[in-house]
């Protein structure tokens, strides 16, 4: 936003930081004129915009992002499969020992950045195949910084946030500054090992090694 405003001094772009559902809703209500999402618009949404007079409205991919899984530093288990992530979200794995026999971390607490966020939708659509999240211990806060703080202070929690939070060095709340947070490595295989599991770093997103990747649209 700052770069756009500097390059176009006669124009002004004002950013509103909100969840994906509300961003799309504001676009449909003409309260904003640009929304950045992690999904394509639906046919009904395109039709709504066309009926409002936006005949040439388009949605284009502009970037790729990954979902990062973060855990408390006290949790020694840092590799996980996509299959086990789905088991957690379906409520089939309720304790850390259901995935890692012998674990003493207790019940699994799942923390999302917002109940209406694109993170929740991705988990339902891409990990659970369109089915709802049924984990008995779900927490939804208001923003990613609160997810990080929750996981940092809760030994049995697993937080799910956008991987951009791992790389923004300007933001001191991001996990690269948190000594009590671990970033999990994720595997597509049946069993996760350090050799077949990847963290959501830019290169592993670029070469598709990291399993939990989403396209960002504008």
Task: Walk through the language-model features, giving the residues of each.
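Signal peptide-directed extracytoplasmic domains
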Residues: 45-52, 56-61
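Short helix C-cap/helix-to-loop transition motifs enriched in small/turn-promoting residues
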Residues: 35, 41-44
């Amino acid at each position: 936003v700052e770069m756009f405003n500097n390059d176009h001094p006669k124009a002004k772009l004002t950013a509103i930081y909100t969840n994906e559902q509300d961003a799309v809703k504001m676009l449909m209500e003409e309260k904003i004129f640009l929304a950045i999402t992690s999904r394509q618009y639906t046919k009904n949404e395109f039709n709504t915009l066309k009926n409002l007079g936006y005949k040439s409205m388009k949605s284009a991919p502009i970037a790729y992002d990954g979902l990062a899984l973060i855990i408390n530093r006290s949790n020694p288990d840092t590799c996980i499969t996509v299959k086990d992530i789905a088991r957690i979200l379906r409520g089939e794995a309720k304790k850390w020992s259901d995935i890692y026999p012998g674990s003493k971390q207790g019940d699994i607490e799942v923390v999302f950045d917002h109940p209406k966020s694109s993170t929740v939708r991705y988990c339902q659509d891409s990990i659970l195949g369109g089915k709802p999240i049924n984990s008995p211990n779900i927490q939804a806060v208001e923003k990613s910084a609160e997810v990080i703080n929750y996981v940092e202070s809760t030994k049995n929690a697993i937080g799910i946030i956008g991987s951009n939070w791992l790389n923004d060095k300007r933001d001191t709340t991001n996990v690269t500054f948190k000594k009590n947070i671990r970033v999990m490595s994720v595997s597509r295989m049946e069993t996760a090992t350090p050799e077949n599991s990847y963290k959501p770093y830019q290169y592993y997103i670029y070469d598709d090694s990291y399993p939990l990747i989403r396209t960002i649209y504008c």
